[in-house]
């Protein structure tokens, strides 16, 4: 896999972007690459002796090698567990591209690959003037889509893919992540997604119970070019 960075987005919030990003980091590390994660903007942070910290960003930090400073992984750590734009307003913080680009540049200098995890679904804004598409353009990186397998995934996946491409960005692959273990016709839905999405398929993750080490699932993902 020759990419130096990519952006992980999803069909919705709560569909496993962080877990998939951690699996990708372990996959890359298993191939001898220095791989680090980044969560540019995170809401729902908790305060500790070291400052505001986000659970997802900490998971990315733990899956990274080398281990970057937390402030590079998560430049904007917002307390309220709401949409980032609302959380930033409540915290009196203005999210700007410059600190995000600067942190990303430092991470790229430390690693062979940077896995950047987005917020919510693709259309979730960062503030009144910055969408995730704005950030991805500024970083000049492609997008990987995580599709949460549950009722409605066909619609959500097709809309998300269309939106990414309409924004003029390159979507280089998609990963199916089983959110609802009781979803009817999972294989049939997966087959339809593979037929209808005009982007490469990187693999399918089964429903994973809490506590599973993401490193154990690295072999299930196969980025294009492998």
UniProtKB/Swiss-Prot annotation:
Homodimer. The keyword tRNA-binding does not apply. Belongs to the dethiobiotin synthetase family. Its main location: cytoplasm. One of its GO terms (biological process) is biotin biosynthetic process. This is ATP-dependent dethiobiotin synthetase BioD. GO terms for molecular function: ATP binding; dethiobiotin synthase activity; magnesium ion binding. Catalyzes a mechanistically unusual reaction, the ATP-dependent insertion of CO2 between the N7 and N8 nitrogen atoms of 7,8-diaminopelargonic acid (DAPA, also called 7,8-diammoniononanoate) to form a ureido ring. It catalyses: (7R,8S)-7,8-diammoniononanoate + CO2 + ATP = (4R,5S)-dethiobiotin + ADP + phosphate + 3 H(+). PANTHER family: DETHIOBIOTIN SYNTHETASE. GO terms for cellular component: cytosol. SUPFAM superfamilies: P-loop containing nucleoside triphosphate hydrolases (SSF52540). Substrate binds at residue 43. Keywords: ATP-binding, Biotin biosynthesis, Cytoplasm, Ligase, Magnesium, Metal-binding, Nucleotide-binding. Pathway: Cofactor biosynthesis; biotin biosynthesis; biotin from 7,8-diaminononanoate: step 1/2. The gene is bioD. Pfam families: AAA_26. HAMAP family: BioD. The active site is at residue 39. Its cofactor is Mg(2+). Its EC number is 6.3.3.3. It is found in: Cytoplasm. Mg(2+) binds at residues 18, 56, 117. InterPro entries: DTB_synth_BioD (IPR004472), P-loop_NTPase (IPR027417). ATP binds at residues 14-19, 56, 117-120, 177-178, 206-208, 213.
């Amino acid at each position: 896999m020759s990419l130096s960075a990519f952006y992980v987005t999803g069909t919705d919030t709560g569909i496993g972007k962080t877990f998939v990003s951690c699996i990708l980091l372990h996959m890359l590390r298993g191939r001898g690459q220095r791989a680090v994660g980044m969560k540019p903007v995170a809401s729902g942070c908790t305060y500790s002796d070291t400052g505001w910290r986000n659970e997802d960003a900490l998971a990315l930090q733990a899956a990274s090698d080398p281990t970057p400073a937390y402030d590079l992984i998560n430049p904007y750590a917002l307390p309220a567990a709401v949409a980032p734009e609302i959380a930033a307003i409540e915290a009196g913080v203005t999210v700007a591209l410059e600190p995000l680009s600067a942190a990303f540049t430092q991470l790229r200098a430390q690693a062979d690959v940077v896995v950047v995890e987005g917020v919510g679904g693709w259309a979730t804004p960062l503030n009144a003037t910055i969408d995730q598409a704005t950030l991805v353009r500024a970083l000049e990186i492609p997008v990987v889509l995580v599709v949460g397998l549950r009722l409605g995934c066909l619609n959500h996946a097709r809309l998300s893919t269309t939106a990414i491409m309409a924004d003029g960005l390159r979507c280089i692959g998609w990963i199916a992540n089983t959110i609802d273990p009781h979803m009817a016709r999972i294989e049939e839905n997966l087959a339809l997604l593979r037929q209808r999405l005009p982007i490469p398929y990187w693999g399918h993750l089964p429903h994973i119970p809490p506590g599973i080490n993401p490193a154990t699932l690295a072999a299930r993902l196969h980025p294009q070019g492998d």
